[in-house]
Design a protein with these regions (language model features):
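Residue(s) in the substrate-gating loop at a strand-loop-helix junction
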Residues: 110
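Canonical Rossmann dinucleotide-binding motif of NAD(H)/NADP(H)-dependent dehydrogenases/reductases
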Residues: 1-12
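Short C-terminal tail/terminal secondary-structure segment
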Residues: 115, 197-215
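Active-site helix of classical SDR
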Residues: 91, 126, 134
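Substrate-binding pocket helix/loop in short-chain dehydrogenase/reductase
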Residues: 67-68, 75-77, 166
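A conserved structural motif in NAD(P)-dependent oxidoreductases
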Residues: 170-181, 192
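Alpha-helical segment proximal to the catalytic Tyr-Lys
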Residues: 96, 138-143, 194
């Protein structure tokens, strides 16, 4: 979102809690994107305050990693609700605004939609569903709205610093950084990507294409 704000977009961030360091110029609105009434209030507020909605970026995501026998239905539903159902609710509520603006939707999935680790069933299912939802929406909202998906791999954060071996494992020679995803999001939001819709972009430094052999 900081990239979009820097590029001159009027940015509204929806979050359950106010971010510690929101991007300069962005407006933060409290919203539970897995809750239908909360999403309706968010979009109604954008309509009133901004009068239009050009781009919707759906990047809410959580993960609960447990063995399947220990994963409760409530935990499963929480992950699916936040990672998948939220995008359905947001697009449904914003459809009229997006069609009027000839806008764009960018969803943020994950390479876990294509490759898995143990005990990630809810997360993998939600992200795989989001990829499918993206191309379905691209057809349903055409020709007024473009819908595309970004599937990041390992994106380094302050709480998860990569080691030298982690960088070397990636064909690109490094682990991803938030700016890698932000740059593609900005491109898909703008007019330069006007002939792109229904696509999934894998941003993982080449890892999903790498053959891995037993040591």
């Amino acid at each position: 979102m900081a990239r979009l704000a820097h590029d001159g977009w009027s940015v509204v961030i929806a979050d359950r809690e106010r971010p510690h360091h929101p991007p300069a110029g962005a407006r933060v609105v409290r919203c539970d994107v897995s809750d239908e009434a909360s999403v309706k209030g968010l979009i109604d507020g954008v309509r009133t305050a901004e009068g239009r909605l050009d781009v919707l970026v759906c990047n809410a995501g959580i993960s609960i990693r447990k063995p399947i026998a220990a994963l409760s239905l409530a935990e499963w539903s929480c992950v699916i609700g936040t990672n998948l159902t939220a995008t359905f609710l947001l697009v449904r509520a914003a459809e009229t605004l997006l069609r009027t603006a000839k806008g764009a939707v960018v969803t943020i999935a994950s390479t876990r939609a294509r490759m898995s680790e143990a005990d990630t069933e809810a997360y993998a299912a939600s992200k795989g569903g989001l990829v499918a939802l993206t191309h379905a929406l691209a057809i349903s909202l055409a020709p007024d709205v473009r819908v595309n998906c970004i599937s990041p791999g390992w994106i380094a954060t302050k709480g998860d610093p990569p080691r030298a071996a982690d960088h070397a494992f990636h064909p690109a020679g490094r682990v991803g950084v938030p700016g890698d995803v932000a740059a593609l999001t900005a491109f898909l939001a703008g007019p330069e990507s006007g002939f792109i819709s229904g696509a999934e972009f894998i941003v993982d430094g080449g890892v999903t294409r790498k053959m891995i052999y037993p040591a």
